[in-house]
Amino acid sequence: MAEKFSLSKFFGMNDEYDDDYAEEPTPATKSTPTPPTRPNDSRKVVAMRTAKPNASHIAICEPRIYSDAKSIAKQLTNGDAVIVNFARVDEAQAQRIVDFLNGTAYAVGGEIKRIGEQIFLCTPHNFEVSGDVAANLGTQVTR
């Protein structure tokens, strides 16, 4: 039993404290509830960028080599429409780039349309293109 008392002292369980003490009651204090604070309504100017968070973006690209198709496809997968001008690329490279972008447009649910002699419009799924410019490509206006 002596070991029991020494272990209890070791763990701080000593019987030498007084259980018979009277606690004085503390007076009850009335606290008034604070009304909820309202945000400061003095900000009456709203930035234009916050007013249109879903603004559409159209990029214009003029590739020179086939590897430029990767950056065009990146913009298309990010949800931007891209106008691509193939004036500085030979016909074989332009065909390869169009094939690559056609696959990218299909993957994102978009489309690619020819809007000029060497100009294409690549759009993701959230763009709607109306009208047909390709039918008028053969007739050019002379002055």
UniProtKB/Swiss-Prot annotation:
Source species, domain of life: Bacteria
Cellular location(s): Cytoplasm
Region span, Disordered: 16-43
Keyword Cytoplasm recorded: yes
Keywords noted in UniProt: Cell cycle, Cell division, Cytoplasm, Septation
Known role: Cell division protein that is part of the divisome complex and is recruited early to the Z-ring. Probably stimulates Z-ring formation, perhaps through the cross-linking of FtsZ protofilaments. Its function overlaps with FtsA.
Protein name: Cell division protein SepF
